[in-house]
Amino acid sequence: MIFYLHGFDATSPGNHEKMRQLQFIDPDVRLISYSTLHPKHDMQHLLKEVAKQMQYSDDPAPLMVGVGLGAYWAERIGFLNGLKSVLINPNLHPEETMQGKIDRPEEYADIANKCVSEFRLKNTHKAMCILSRVDDVLDSQATAEALKPYYPIEWDEIQPHKFPQLATYLPKIKAFKLG
């Protein structure tokens, strides 16, 4: 089972396409949708929804996959549920990058402060990161510097921020899920 968490652009048709691509790894791909506008409510909703969905699966190794803002949540929700996660162009600091896009971006900083201390250290090797060198939204080099002590990083030379084509990485994602 793969949980797919969309980015800030929840209605993008690219989300459906990425889910179809992930079905080459596991036919059971589930979209876990969230508002993107209310971080505290989103966290509660995502925790409840993932716990509920896990009750209906016998997969011994479910995987969280998120893009952009979805990767922010995949890392945290995956950690809190003991799941591996794949972070594609993760938005590590939405309290900064979401300024002007949502009403209360500071809620992300509050969530980070209340999260388990040093959670990445405790989550080492339980996530893999795929970064675009040509990300048109985030500073992928800064993201790599923040995450490389904890997670393996794969670099892509072509894909933009929303990362529409996962095909090249499907074998690595599958190996990570099963490994």
From Swiss-Prot:
Domain of life: Bacteria
Cystine crosslinks: none
Pfam families per the UniProt record, alphabetical: UPF0227
Similarity-based family: Belongs to the UPF0227 family.
Designated name of the protein: UPF0227 protein Shewmr7_1806
Lineage of source species: Bacteria, Pseudomonadati, Pseudomonadota, Gammaproteobacteria, Alteromonadales
